[in-house]
Structure formats: C-alpha cells, structure tokens
Amino acid sequence: MAIERTLSIIKPDATRRNLTGAINARFEEAGLRIVGQKRLRLTTAQAEGFYEVHKERSFFGSLVEFMTSGPVVVQVLEGENAVLKNREVMGATNPANAAEHTIRKDFAESIEANSVHGSDSAENAAHEIAYFFAQTEIVA
C-alpha cells in the first residue's frame, strides 16, 4: 500500500458549529495524519480559482458564496491510500446517501453545506495541496 497525501477542507457550516476537532478525530481514528493545517477565510478569487473546474455548472455561484461565507480549515492528510480512505470517512457528497457514521451523515446540513471537501484522485490531491500549501508548511 502506498503512503499518499490528500487535501481536506472543513467547510464553513462545520467551522461555524465548532466541529473541527470532532472531524479531525474522525480522520485520525481512520489512520490519517494531519501534516498541514490552517484556518482561513477564502476570498472570492481563491474560491473561484479552487473550484474553477465547476465554473460552467449551475451551482458554481452559490458554491463560491457558501465557501466564502465563513472560515474554512484546509488540511493535508497523509496515510496509506489517503485519497480513498478520506473519501470513505467523508461519505457520499449528498448526506442523504452517505453511509452511517461518516462525517457527512453525522454533521452535514445539506448537499452543499456538507461539512467537508476531499480530493477525488491522487493527481487532483497534488494540485489542490499546492493551491493552499507551500512544501515548507507540510510537516510529516
């Protein structure tokens, strides 16, 4: 098994409810190490740039508005098969379809306010990590 890194974002709906610690505990219980973490408030330009792949989708404007509505916690998670493991811990994008005891099933408010973002591939993880972190900010 390969040690990988993936990006996680704890979204404004979760930071507003002080769920950062509870969500971090889920990652750590699953064997993922938090090797980079910062709390910030995304600018409109940052959110638009990060979600640029969705620019032509109907939900793009509301997604950017939501992601800039409050603080987020951006994180680099590391572990064996980190991308897949993180996606399993998060649960399905739509919390109504998420498995029991996943972050989204337990904490999400809606399909948009679903508490967390996670990279969907190792390639995207590398790109997303570089978007928010310099190599010197990641300490394994």
Swiss-Prot record:
Homotetramer. Major role in the synthesis of nucleoside triphosphates other than ATP. The ATP gamma phosphate is transferred to the NDP beta phosphate via a ping-pong mechanism, using a phosphorylated active-site intermediate. Its cofactor is Mg(2+). The active site is at H117. GO terms for cellular component: cytoplasm. It catalyses: a 2'-deoxyribonucleoside 5'-diphosphate + ATP = a 2'-deoxyribonucleoside 5'-triphosphate + ADP; a ribonucleoside 5'-diphosphate + ATP = a ribonucleoside 5'-triphosphate + ADP. Keywords: ATP-binding, Cytoplasm, Kinase, Magnesium, Metal-binding, Nucleotide metabolism, Nucleotide-binding, Phosphoprotein, Transferase. SUPFAM superfamilies: Nucleoside diphosphate kinase, NDK. GO terms for molecular function: ATP binding; metal ion binding; nucleoside diphosphate kinase activity. CDD domains: NDPk_I. It comes from Rhodospirillum rubrum (strain ATCC 11170 / ATH 1.1.1 / DSM 467 / LMG 4362 / NCIMB 8255 / S1). InterPro entries: NDK-like_dom, NDK-like_dom_sf, Nucleoside_diP_kinase. Belongs to the NDK family. Its main location: cytoplasm. This is Nucleoside diphosphate kinase. PROSITE patterns: NDPK_LIKE. It is found in: Cytoplasm. One of its GO terms (biological process) is GTP biosynthetic process. The keyword Amino-acid biosynthesis does not apply.
